[in-house]
A protein has these predicted regions:
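Carbohydrate-binding surfaces of carbohydrate-active enzymes
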Residues: 2, 6-230
């Protein structure tokens, strides 16, 4: 007498930004929203080769056991889908989010946000032709902009490395766009401080922490406030 346990028998899907994450030592591995794990029934409920192999094995061992044939869902072929609307994030930022002002950067949790993106904004005066910036303790992936021009992208362990930028004006706008790529949902890191997203310490210009930040929460739960009539860059 024995039994088998299939994990999983039926694949599934997480929607939106609820993808989750696996903890592996000091590294977090974001998961995709497809939750399949080579299941006998795939994400859309269709049988796979594994399903038919199990069916064959069961029929050989238990020939009298009735087995129904699974339904196969119809799907359309993949085609190119043209974009009808597009707009730059900076162009429509004020229509989709209102800034929260603080001296130092706040985490996503401190701002009452669970998932999505968070844009940090401040300004810096030009003291030299080149400035060294560092984002200290950020999660999970960042893009840094000077006057809305992309300068660098950093991910996980890269965050904290020096970013050298040219400041073209006397006063320059600094934007740091942070993406929350998923929190762990089991294991030793479940309640760890590393699961707090956004900038958890601060941003340094040379040896000093930058202050006077505006934070724009971007959960992206709705597109109703996006103004597509504005500029695309």
């Amino acid at each position: 007498l024995g039994s088998i346990n299939l994990y999983m028998f039926h694949g599934g899907t997480n929607f939106g930004f609820m993808n989750g994450c696996s903890a592996r030592g000091t590294i977090d591995l974001p998961q995709i929203t497809s939750y399949d794990y080579d299941a006998p029934l795939d994400e859309q409920g269709n049988p796979t080769e594994k399903y038919f192999a199990l069916q064959k094995m069961l029929h050989e061992e238990y020939p009298a056991l009735p087995q129904a044939e699974p339904l196969v869902k119809e799907s359309f072929a993949q085609t190119a889908i043209p974009l009808t609307n597009k707009v730059s994030l900076f162009a429509t930022l004020e229509t989709i989010s209102q800034p929260v002002v603080s001296v130092y950067p706040q985490t996503m949790e401190q701002l009452g946000q669970n998932t999505g993106y968070l844009l940090y904004r401040t300004s810096i005066e030009k003291d030299a032709a080149e400035e060294k910036l560092r984002v200290i303790d950020g999660r999970d992936r960042l893009q840094l902009f000077v006057n809305q021009v992309h300068q660098a992208t950093q991910y996980q362990t890269e965050i904290g490395e020096d970013i050298y930028v040219t400041l073209p004006q006397e006063n320059n706008q600094i934007d740091v766009l942070i993406e929350n790529m998923g929190r762990v949902n089991y294991g030793h890191k479940l309640f760890a401080d590393t699961q707090k997203k956004g900038i958890r310490t601060g941003v340094m210009a040379d040896l000093h922490f930058m202050t006077q930040w505006q934070q724009y929460c971007l959960p992206m739960t709705s597109c109703e406030q996006v103004d597509y009539s504005r500029e695309w860059q």
